[in-house]
Amino acid sequence: MSDIDRSRAQQLMREADIEALVLFQPEAFRYAVGAHAGVATMWGRAGSAIALVPADADAPIAAVVSDHAASLVRRAAPDIDLRCHRIWIDIVDLSGAETIAQVDDAYRRNNSGGPRPETFVRAACFGLLADLLRERGLSAARIGADLEFMPAADFLALRQALPDVDWVDGSPVLRRLRAVKSGREIELLRRAAAAAEAGLVAMAAAVRPGAALGGLSAAWKAGAQAHAAKSGFSLSGHWDYISVGPALSDMAAVVTPGALIKADVGTLVDGYSSDGARSFSWGPVSPLAADVFSALEAAFASGLEVIRPGNTFGAVHAAMLASMRRQGFSEYYRGHFGHSVGGGVGIEEWPFFSHDNPEIILPGMVVALEAPFYGEGLGALMIEDQFLVTTAGAECMNSLPRTLRDLSRA
């Protein structure tokens, strides 16, 4: 099922003066339709999967997909108005067939025989979209497309194929829609955060003198996967940025006495990525490292106080930067102190806790608040947690303490 709040989508589209969204990015397609866009999206070109979301909340969502993906889309989203195009993959329903002649009959019966394209035919896809727009009375409408994704060559072809449509950038509307999560999305992000945190526990247990960075990464991954399996779900992906010691880019680093260990990690559940970080050491750290981490703790607390509905993302950045200034860091400057999380292309999603960002914090957003410091010759330190914004404030999805933990004392 779609994760779009159709009432909110209607409001945002009316404010943007558009009559529909037409979405081409695979992740946006899945968000709108509730099903994967199919293998023909692998080249990052527009057309093989298209979602049409009318501004009218009562009008059904429609989609253009490949014949290869059609059955999966129908099962996942039976209410979608679906149009299909042929791609290169030959597939036929052989139910009941026992001979080669019956195989040929099956092709004819299912209308799946005949020539197929090298990949997919963009013009055919745009033609199916034109049919949908004509049937919905949108052939000459002002329509928003996700131009932040769409390749320039494909957009040029789209405008040539549908010249009467007033195409505008619908990306801001899509971003605002995706920033507020559905209940399903929130649950996926909770699971992802829990798995990543279980991985941190496993990683911490593997830290000892001589332990290699690669081994810590493997321990984290194993712990995250074990938690997911035990909890009855699977991971669709994972990532980690772990640093050990004073050389930030030394991927062959090993744990030594006094070494700082920073683990910025996330797992994906059904395409939705968590984001969190903790800092550790093996043995006492230098006075400078202790001072830096103390400042990060204060900045994190200052930012967290501001994560309330009605405040701006920029206000969080201002609070954290002001805290660092009070701690004596007059030159330190982060471009952002965190961001939304979800099921988009990257780990970090808009909106960001950045300077003067006027975007309003809303209930239902899931965000990652981060306070990092990278010091070549010292090491990396970071605090990051994931929060659900509620009407009362911010609910943390993590449980590990935010301290700089000396693992030699564990």
Residue map of PLM features:
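Active-site neighborhoods and metal-handling regions in enzymes and metal-associated proteins
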Residues: 1-410
